[in-house]
Amino acid sequence: MGDREAVLLEALSRCGLRGLSQAWVDSVWELDFTETEPLDSRIEAEITENGLETFSSLHENLLAFASEDPENSRSVWLLFSENDICRNSLVALLSHFIQAAANKKANAIQRILALNAAGLYFLLLEIPGSVANQVFHPVLFDKSVNALEKCWPRDPNASRKRKKDTLKSSQGDNRGGRKRPRPPRRDEQEMEDLSEEEQDEEEVYFSTRDLMHIRDSIFLVLKNFLRLLPKFSLKEKPQSVLHCIQIFINLTSFESVPQEMPFSDAVSVNHMKYVPELAYHGLWLLCLPIHGEGNQTVRRLFQRLLSVILMMKGGEGSNSALLVISPPVISARNQAIRFISFLVNELKEGTIPVLNILLQHICVKFPDKADYRVYAAQALVKLMENLPNAEYAIFIEWLYKYSKNSKISYRVFALEVVVALLDLPEREADVSLPHENLNFLQHKFLLQHMVFSRCSDKAPTVRSKALSCLAQCLEKNSTTAIDGVQELLQGSSCRTVFGTNITETTGNGTVYASNANEATTHPQKTMATLKIIEVSDTGDTLSSDGKEVLTMLRYRAGDEKTNVRKSALQVLVNVLKCHLIPCSSEDLSTLQDRCRDPAVSVRKQALTSLTELLLAQPHSVLIQKAWLTGLIPVVLDTESSVQEKALECLDQLLLQSITHYKRFKQDDERQKLTWDLLTLLTSESQDLSRYLTKAFHLWSKQDKFSSTFITNLISHTETEHTAPAWMILSKVAGSSPKLDYTKILQSWERVSRQTDADINTTGHILCVIGHIAKHLPADTRTHLIDHVKSWLKEFKSSPEVISPAVEALQKLCHAQTDKPEDVQDLLNDVCGEIVSACEHHISSVVMADCKDEPLDQDLLVKHLFTLGEVAQLCPAKVEKRVLLLVQSILASSVTTEQNSCHSDAEDPPVSQPLSQFKGSNMPSLIRAHAFITLGKLCLQHEDLAKKCIPALARELEVCDDVAIRNNVIIVICDLCIRYTTMVDRYIPNVSVCLRDRDPFIRKQTLIMLTNLLQEEFVKWKGSLFFRFVSVLVDPDPEIAKFGEFCLVHLLLKRNPVMFSQHFIECIFHFNCYEKHEKYNKFAQTKRERTLFSLKGKENKDKRMKIYKFLLEHFTDEQRFNLTTKISHNVLACFVDGILPIDMEANELLSDIFDIMSSKEIKLSAMRSKPGEDVGADDDEMAMANAVMQAAQKKLISQVQKKNFVENIIPIITSLKGFLEQHRIPAVRDLMNYLREMMQDYRDEIKDFFAADKQLAAELEYDMKKYEEQLEREQEENVQNPPSAESTGSPKGSPRAVNAISSPRSPNAPKSPLSTNAQTPGGAAPCTPITTPRVSILKGQGPRPRQMSLSTLAILNSARKAAQDNKKQRSKSIGAQPSTPSPARTTSSKQVTFRSEDQQSDSSLVGRMISTPDVTIENVTFGAGVSYISASQTPLSGRRGSIGSHEKERDVLCIMSPDKPAPQPRKWNVESPVQRRSIRQRISGKAPLKPSN
């Protein structure tokens, strides 16, 4: 025993404790180890020289005292006292070395010494009696623990790496609307970089050996510390516990562990080999009861592990940063999750509440970036596995309410969690679980209530995520998912709760998010420890049925956001694939429409979805047709990737399964599907086969068609697949290698002899012959030429076969010789015979005198059609007689001519009918085909075209037969390509057919005009544009939809300014307003005006539909310019007096104000909320885009506000006064526009009116009265629904209730109010005895404007005072309530009193409102009510009878009887110079002349 003590004393003596100054020791303790004076350099050098050995020896000797039983051994503290060794000196010395390691410049020896010193300090604490001897000091303890981390050398580039490798947390900075911090100045940044470089230069270099020694020292000291923890209680030292937790957590990622760490209490520290293992063991030891009762330590531990799980670095709030996702980071996260699970299993019930809180905080603090969000959701689900069923159900209930929080990112995260939960097996219910919680254990609940309810979320990202989750669940074919969706589709009680509050009460503040229907984000405060996050449910329950589910899916397939549409398609297809509902035409139509979606990704998804659905249900003919209709036209897609996808799907289903007929099996579903699809292409869907030509052309470039493929096809030509096999052969023959022509020629020989051969098959065979003509021997070609010619001359085939036959004949002749002259000679010989045969038969029919013989119409049609086809190949063989014969067939009958002459006498026709042959009475079928033939002849004979084109245009007007009008349209449009200048003047005649009574003609005209406009054979001249866009309101919705497609996808792309150039004139044209000097000045007949007129209130909705459609496809620049143009070129004309303000202008102005108030005219940056959906965006660029969008919106908003204030407000305010003055109902729409604008530009409007407070007060008063009027109307509409008589009454502003004729429109309709003001006996409405004179001074700014008394109380007072003071004469104005009830309009009198002075004196026009022209006694105006000049006030009709002249001249000025008597009115004397300056200032802001 004595030897051991002697050795210890020897080791202590080598530490030089006796040489330490007592003053230095005392200062170290007094300063609480925070600051120290430098140690005597001699003593430090002496210890450092043999420091490692000294500290190791001391550690070894002290360890014996720590490990022995204190009862059986002598106390070391007694030994210190007996030998006069000051323990404070030893502790102070150790602290000096521990402190030295904190310096970045510390070398390897200093760091190792620091670790050894920290180990010695831990050993001193481990020795019994250390607390009583006051060895423990919290600061030194924390520094010793800190040494475990600080002694490890930091990477010299760590500071620079941190900036690159960490990402700013999207949820960390929750400062709401505060300004962003000022970026560092460039010079400051450069200085910081220089200082960092200097520090880097001063960094000490560590060799590998040094690093190994330091690592080993850390490992040994950490083991010593872990030996201390079970013995040394930290229960009273919570800050030290917290510090230990943080250091241990940092050490868990100190080095990589090759295998999965076993977390177990049974594992000995001595068996651990890695620092992270020791660190986790240390965390486990800190959770023991010795260091704290309850779950406080666990709570602190979980809070610190939260950042590891979320892969974040730094503290919470604005200081947090995201770690780059890497294998070490993911490994640390996984270890933390496993350790938490270990703790929960070990500590049981005590940790469950804390785990529940941790789960809640994961939901609230996850990084809002796609990858991090997924990892956080997976971590949450793994931790949820540790919850018992009861707690699991409670948390799911919390999560359900959380999923409806107002923050978009929360709702998206809830969906991520649900997706991960659905991957786990469903939990089985316990007997002890309350019945109301059973639902929360079921996957069905997650699917129906948490996924499906979010499919209609107002945030696009949430909708997209929910639909994507739903699609994933169905794709996995899990029974629970399918059952859950099945219940939804069957309309079981699916309840959706809206309205959830999340409240988190902490010591520092509260996190609060109000309503799920308000996507607002509230600040999140930093919390000291984990606190429970409470979620309250305040919403109503809504149920949905199966029809609503399908309706929702179809609606979402047309959502404004690309990702939502794409996800909706996936869900819809998976629902159909799983046979949860039968395929309906509506569902398939939705999929077909998405094949033409504007977004590339949606088009690709639609192609994939349709193909998957067809493969899942290959026997459904409905799906087969939908697949063909949706997919085949996409081969013409302008986007190459979409085109390639379509070709891939076509190749997969149409080509790959074509094998030799010998290997064809009926039970092979893929082969059967291929031939079913090809058969449809030759029958019901044969119109789509023309698109296949493009596909086969593209495939031919890829050498898709081998000789084996051709052989396989030919093997099917004499089987039940004959028609589709020949159809495919006709497409591939032109690009395929040489074929076995024998089989093809034999088929032609056989088919040509059959009288009942299939038309399509015959045409395809002839097409194949044309393709292989150049490969045939010369004698075979000669034989075929004669054969085809003879076959045509028999005239037994229908027109559908004649065209391919003539084309084959042409190709055979071209292949026969190489010289063009010889080819034409051959064609003249061959085709000349056919022309002669046609001429002979047509002549015999036309010239026949016998009327009794029945006409063989089919035969004549065949001759006419053949003539038109072959005449184009040999124009020299077509004689004038042939032309006259065709014209004679087309000559109109006498009856038709006479009718047409009287049909439109006032508008002489621009063209004359064919008049050479009168009395021709050919059937419509013959005439229809004859027009086609004539058109083909005109293509080769220009003189004939000059003669026939006017007659063709006239035929469109007079002919009633649909087939004839259709063919004439086709002929005129084809001739327009050949003779553009000649036909151009007759394009208006063709465009009239857009209003044809037959839908087929309207659509055909639309197609033909679109083709001409695309190729620019026709320009947008005259009324063509306005007639074209009128198709948007076609009564047939299919035609209207097709018109939208033509305008947007075909024409607007070629001419992006097309809509903006014609927009203003659209307003004039559709309102039939022709008084403007520039707009709507093209020539039209009365019939054309009537056909295309959209004038009147009954067509208001149609006009607005056109306007809004055009505006939706404007660019922002075009929208911005349009507002200014409307103000300067239209509204200013009314203000300047260039255009009269009358009832004819009412609808025009009403449309303009509705357009200017519409959301479509607002700039896109102003309509959308920047960043409203960025919170959950998967794209890193989304955040940057949101910032750009916000800056763009701010800039555009400033420019738009400036434009509004400088260019629009002056004109609008001036025009408002004029409209009120003339009682034009459009003033109501103006007020609505002002109300909309004042919401956006209230401050700017106040600034503008700062110089004219009178005008500002009047405008504010008017707006107030207008809003009161709207409220009254809404209340009356609820209480008393409007009758048929009152619904037609135009509503004006508070000042413009009665609309009457103005002097500029004497024939304008009277106000509907005058109709209501009739006597019960039906007397005619009263009219004013004089017409008020209107003086519009050109170039003058807005005059002082007049206000009406629109308050019902004042009106009642007026009536009462009128009975008492009939003979009193003064100035006033009578007014009515804006929306009189039927009872009131029939029982009260409308009285307008005027004095003689008012009727004659026009000098009062410019008088200020506050200056009386005569003395007023005992009467005054109500507060805020202006005077309205007599010469500007129209008279209202007076109900009752047309009374005496004296009664009508009675005048009364009144005020409310209960008002106090007014003070005598003062004169408002104002300098004319001042008044002139004010007017000039106002007019200077309003350029009232049209700008060019």
From Swiss-Prot:
Which portions of the chain have biased composition (kind: Polar residues)? 1277-1290
- Provide GO CC annotations from the record: condensed chromosome, centromeric region; condensin complex; nucleus
Region labeled Disordered — which residues? 152-201, 1269-1345, 1359-1406, 1454-1492
Q: Which Pfam families match?
A: Cnd1
- Recite the UniProt keywords alphabetically: Cell cycle, Cell division, DNA condensation, Mitosis, Nucleus, Repeat
Give me the stretches of Acidic residues compositional bias. Answer: 189-201
Q: Where in the cell is it found?
A: Nucleus
**Record's compositionally biased regions (Low complexity):** 1377-1388
* Record flagged with keyword Repeat: yes
Q: How does it assemble?
A: Component of the condensin-2 complex, which contains the smc2 and smc4 heterodimer, and three non SMC subunits, ncapg2, ncaph2 and ncapd3 that probably regulate the complex.
What this chain does, per the record? Regulatory subunit of the condensin-2 complex, a complex which establishes mitotic chromosome architecture and is involved in physical rigidity of the chromatid axis.
Q: Which PANTHER family match?
A: CONDENSIN (PTHR14222), CONDENSIN-2 COMPLEX SUBUNIT D3 (PTHR14222:SF1)
What is this protein called in UniProt?
Condensin-2 complex subunit D3-L
What gene codes for this chain?
Answer: ncapd3.L
